């Protein structure tokens, strides 16, 4: 690795640690010529994951976009940012492990709703109302009834 200060090729690694749940390595380096210290990151190059939207438009998957939607759904709710991040990471992990380079926005939404329903019901309803684009109050009420029935069946077990 070249020193970013003097371009010398001889550097030594002072510290190396995994980051991003082991998907990357952060290395602290020092130039053997000038003593300049700098940080490098090593990441696995991932094949882009393409999302096929409802209208057929294709775009690259963005964890940040997913996070924004989750943060919006969990706004003013007792849901920690770490929980939101773990949901986004879990969804991305499932998508990448499936091995399909293209995924429908529908399947992403269903995964998010499944995970979010276990965390906070109000956030789940908020996300579902935007994702499923409820046309009227009866569809919205049907979704709420499903949540209530699911809760009752879980408590009965």
From Swiss-Prot:
Keywords: ATP-binding, DNA-binding, Metal-binding, Nucleotide-binding, Repressor, Transcription, Transcription regulation, Zinc, Zinc-finger. Residues 49-139 form the ATP-cone domain. Pfam families: ATP-cone, Zn_ribbon_NrdR. One of its GO terms (molecular function) is zinc ion binding. It comes from the Bacteria. NCBIfam families: transcriptional regulator NrdR. This is Transcriptional repressor NrdR.
């Amino acid at each position: 690795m070249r020193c970013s200060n003097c371009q010398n090729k001889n550097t030594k690694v002072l510290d190396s640690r995994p980051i991003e749940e082991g998907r990357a390595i952060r290395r602290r380096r020092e130039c053997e010529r000038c003593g300049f210290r700098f940080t490098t990151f090593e990441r696995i190059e991932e094949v882009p994951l393409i999302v096929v939207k409802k209208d057929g438009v294709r775009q690259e998957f963005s964890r940040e976009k997913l996070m924004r939607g989750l943060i919006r759904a969990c706004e003013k709710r007792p849901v920690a940012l770490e929980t939101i991040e773990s949901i986004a990471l879990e969804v991305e992990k499932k998508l990448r492990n499936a091995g399909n380079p293209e995924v429908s926005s529908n399947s992403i939404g269903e995964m998010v709703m499944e995970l979010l329903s276990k965390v906070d019901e109000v956030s789940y309803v908020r996300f579902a109302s935007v994702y499923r684009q409820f046309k009227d109050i009866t569809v919205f009420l049907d979704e709420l009834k499903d949540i209530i029935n699911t809760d009752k069946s879980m408590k009965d077990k």
